[in-house]
């Protein structure tokens, strides 16, 4: 198995390892700044002189175009997808993002890159498909594109999409259960709002509220499971948990903790009995958002299940292909 190159945050090799994620972050900054560029001015203190600083106020025609955020998001997600695909040309370098103490937080390998392609690909298609679908629908008359000029909700929608992609990417890269949970919640909160984004539609608002309530309960139960695993092992690192399961894997505390953690991932893949909000969420959301829920969100839940079941819960399972060997092969891809 090839060696892992350890890289500290913002050290040598950091940008190359997390290039797709940094592209997403740059796109987020662009979505926050560019749609707000306008004819804003500020007064110099103690004077009556006003200076234009191109932020706020009446926006320019191009920056107020409702399709501009869609193009920024589509190009950003598409660039992240292409960068992820290109990383396979010469083989994926196994790079770990570590703290000063050497603790692994993120791991870039073939396993994570494959799921990142799924996430970024699905979100790219959804962002492009939403370009002409954000006109208000439901209650009241449908607005034309011209009526949507200076409507800042357009940028909000795509900011949520990029935030969702960033959270999903963290889930794929995580080597610590708490880091994985942070990525899961970052993506989940974005999807809650995306489902209920059409505030003019009663169906969308109700669907988003149900999705949020069920998801919050599942996340709370999962977080309680994390605390039980930390109490048992003293760490949430996957390798530490796997080693502890080899020694004391039959203790009731970690088994209960694993069960609680799986509740959170079960909600993301709409596994029974955590599927109650799924039908409303799919019907209340727009078609592109429903597509993200059906593909990228499900893939994110599968990553969590693989991390827990193949790495932690059964590190020495026997059979045609043991779980630990499968994990090592995934690390080597």
Q: Each predicted region: which residue ranges?
A:
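Alpha-helical transmembrane segments of multi-pass membrane proteins predominantly involved
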Residues: 1-333
